[in-house]
From Swiss-Prot:
Binding partners and assembly: Heterotetramer of two alpha chains (FadB) and two beta chains (FadA).
Keywords, alphabetical: Fatty acid metabolism, Isomerase, Lipid degradation, Lipid metabolism, Lyase, Multifunctional enzyme, NAD, Oxidoreductase
Protein name in the entry: Fatty acid oxidation complex subunit alpha
Site (described: Important for catalytic activity): 120, 140
């Protein structure tokens, strides 16, 4: 053994060839934390000191190669002054450069995922051989930063600036065949041939058949582009990427600027340029929010995994109520491998559900994400039925009938008598109390809520609602099934609107107040889209459906009359009464035409102004900042109340619910992190400025206490 640490070992394989193996003890994956970086330095020194070493193969003892840097360390690291961040990055890069400068050839054997720092380690090697099952990429832009271990320097010099810009600015993972095509790897082999492939390359380099020094040299030099080529490559890329990423996500464009700025430098000077830009991005609020989201997502996954221990295995599912929603649920279950019965009382509804599932599967085939054989397999896993004949072996039933408590209670009571005693019943409801629905059941302990968001195949969140009598097994089994369906489940306790809709309706309430104050809804949409929402509130209400919004608002007003009941007619009332129901009937706040792809396209319709005129009670001058605050303050305060009321257990779950469920701007991190970014005391003072708008704008006593004590939601 040449070197042995807790994350890295170096041992002889054969005739001067050594293996530098990453295998971080006590962890399921390899990652670059402080320990691993320090051991890499020591391992490189040990290799340098051993004159018998003729070549080095870099490998992994895990199923993955290296997933990247340890993101949990980012939080503390990024609090350091910018100069210290730059110095720390340069120190880390000296380790990678020392490996790259070894006087012997090096080969990286990529057995699994190599992302971020994992790929950057491979780029420092002379040759790369990749398993057909592996993926590589530099996803740092998704965290608001860019590669900091030499990725912006080595990758462009290896695969060309155009390819490197695409890889780095998109943050995408790349399959083996694509990596080989652009020259990111030198060979692709079957998993079982990986070590043999690496040995073959290293032996050919040692023998002189391959000139490893010539292979290494371009990575040490400036980019081979003249001034005109640079301008054409980088200016075009910056314009395109800026349009794709938008103004709220600076990292992709900054990465291109860094590659451009370092293009005329050799490796070491180029690494200094990278380190300076990396440190600047690391200090932005966008990076703080996106890293926070990543860590929140990891917490969600840990919490969901904790349910596995007591969850029953779902081998057969059923959905009650076909149509678009039922078809979407059936599709999601079947495509992820769980066969499902789809029951309705009407043949035409069954056909609608099957058509929806078939359409979604067909779309995946068209995009190359599914083979026709797999599509047929998934369709065969959806069994339509008009009766309960096959329900005896069902493990979970998702009820997705009309949003009416009496209908749901009747259907749930009926199906309870048709399934085995330990089968779980789950209601896909967005507003109706789970405790109320449970009253119709003989076994309420087996009943939970399972709120899917529309469209089911696109929205990642599922709210699993725990009723007063729901057992932990019922909750755990539903969480496990949601995970199996490829969703991100969050467990919440029962209340009107649960988490997401309870928070969304105060946001709509702020919007209603603005329209009633004479503010143009088109202007409101533009301001909120610029703030970062995927669509403005008027457009969102049209997509949801004015009738759905009208019903939901009434449910919320009944549940929280002190702050959500408004005696005055609102814009939603006016549109509902005028039968302007949104996209579903072609007119709501906007009118809708069909575009070339057959999708609804919104256009302004002057007729709506006459519909809205009776509900405009004043003409108030408001700034764009006022518009944001009228809407965001009540949303944030309701999120705080959900946390304080125990509807959601943690701040992380609350924020992720909003990002996954309603498209809260990810670069702002969620409602509670948004409060943190303003400062709790400053947010309370801001809310107090709008106190005259009503109780939705009044901070809770506990939040005032947090402000007084200088506390935050995230430390």
């Amino acid at each position: 053994m040449i070197y042995e640490g807790k994350a890295i070992t170096v041992k002889a394989l054969e005739s001067g060839i050594v293996e530098l193996k990453f295998d971080l003890k006590g962890e399921s994956v390899n990652k670059f934390n402080r320990l691993t970086l320090n051991e890499l330095r020591q391992a490189v020194d040990a290799i340098k000191a051993d004159a018998s070493v003729k070549g080095v193969i870099v490998s992994s003892g895990k199923d993955v190669f290296i997933v990247g840097a340890d993101i949990t360390e980012f939080v503390d690291n990024f609090k350091l002054p910018e100069a210290e961040l730059v110095a720390g990055n340069l120190e880390a890069n000296r380790i990678f450069s020392a490996f790259e400068d070894l006087e012997v050839p090096t080969v990286a054997a990529i057995n699994g995922i190599a992302l971020g720092g994992g790929l950057e380690m491979c780029l420092a090697a002379d040759y790369r051989v990749m398993s057909t099952s592996a993926k590589i990429g530099l996803p740092e832009v998704k965290l608001g930063i860019y590669p900091g271990f030499g990725g912006t320097v080595r990758l462009p010099r290896l695969i060309g600036s155009d390819n490197a810009v695409e890889w780095i600015a998109s943050g995408k993972e790349n399959r083996a065949e694509d990596a080989l095509k652009v020259g990111a790897v030198d060979a692709v082999v079957a998993p079982e041939l990986l070590q043999a492939g690496a040995l073959d390359l290293i032996k050919r380099a040692i023998s002189g058949e391959l000139d490893y020094k010539a292979k290494r040299q371009p990575k040490l030099e400036k980019l081979k582009l003249n001034a005109i080529e640079q301008m054409m490559a980088f200016e075009t890329a910056k314009g395109f990427v800026a349009g794709q990423a938008g103004p709220n996500y600076p990292a992709p464009v900054e990465a291109i600027k860094t590659i451009q700025k370092a293009a005329n430098f050799g490796r070491d000077k180029a690494l200094e340029v990278e380190a300076a830009g990396f440190a600047k991005l690391a200090k932005t609020s966008v990076a703080e929010s996106l890293i926070g989201l990543f860590l929140n997502d990891q917490e969600l996954k840990r919490k969901a995994k904790a349910h596995d221990e007591i969850a029953h295995d779902v081998k057969q599912a059923a959905v009650l109520g076909a149509g678009i929603m039922g078809g979407g649920i059936a599709y999601q279950s079947a495509v992820k491998g769980t066969p499902i019965l789809m029951k309705d009382i009407r043949e035409e509804a069954i056909q609608l559900g099957l058509n929806e599932a078939s359409k979604l599967l067909g779309n995946r085939v068209d995009k190359g994400r599914l083979t026709p054989a797999k599509m047929a397999e998934a369709l065969n896993a959806i069994r339509p039925t008009l009766s309960y004949g096959d329900f005896a072996n069902v493990d979970i039933v998702v009820e997705a009938v009309v949003e009416n408590p009496k209908v749901k209670q009747a259907v749930l009571a009926e199906v309870e008598g048709q399934v085995k005693e330990d089968a779980i019943l789950a209601s896909n409801t967005s507003t109706i109390s789970i405790n109320l629905l449970a009253k119709a059941l003989k076994r309420p302990e087996n009943f939970v809520g399972m709120h899917f968001f529309n469209p089911v195949h696109m929205m990642p969140l599922v709210e699993v609602i725990r009723g007063e009598k729901s057992s932990e097994v019922a909750v755990a089994t539903t969480v496990a099934y949601a995970k199996k369906m490829g969703k991100n489940p969050i467990v919440v306790n029962d209340c009107p609107g649960f988490l997401v809709n309870r928070v969304l309706f105060p946001y709509f309430g702020g919007f209603a107040k603005l329209v009633s104050a004479g503010v143009d809804f088109v202007r409101i949409d533009k301001v909120m889209e610029k703030f970062g929402w995927p669509m403005g509130p008027a457009y969102l209400m049209d997509v949801v459906g004015i009738d759905t919004g009208h019903h939901g608002r009434d449910v919320m007003a009944e549940g929280f009359p002190d702050r959500m009941k408004d005696e005055r007619r609102s814009a939603v009332d006016a549109l509902y009464e005028a039968n302007r129901l949104g996209q579903k009937n072609g007119k709501g706040f906007y009118a809708y035409e069909t575009d070339k792809r057959g999708k609804p396209k919104k256009v302004f319709d002057a007729a709506v102004l006459d519909v809205l005129k009776p509900i405009v009670f004043e003409q108030r001058e408001v700034t764009d900042e006022d518009i944001i605050n009228w809407m965001m303050v009540p949303l944030c305060l309701e999120t705080v109340r959900c946390l304080e009321d125990g509807i959601v257990e943690t701040a992380a779950e609350a924020d992720m619910g909003l990002v996954y469920g309603i498209g809260f701007p990810p670069f702002r991190g969620g409602a509670l992190r948004y409060i943190d970014s303003i400062g709790v005391a400053e947010f309370v003072a801001l809310a107090d400025q709008y106190a005259d708008l009503g109780p939705l704008y009044h901070p809770t006593a506990k939040l005032r206490e947090m402000a007084k004590n200088g506390q935050r939601f995230f430390n």
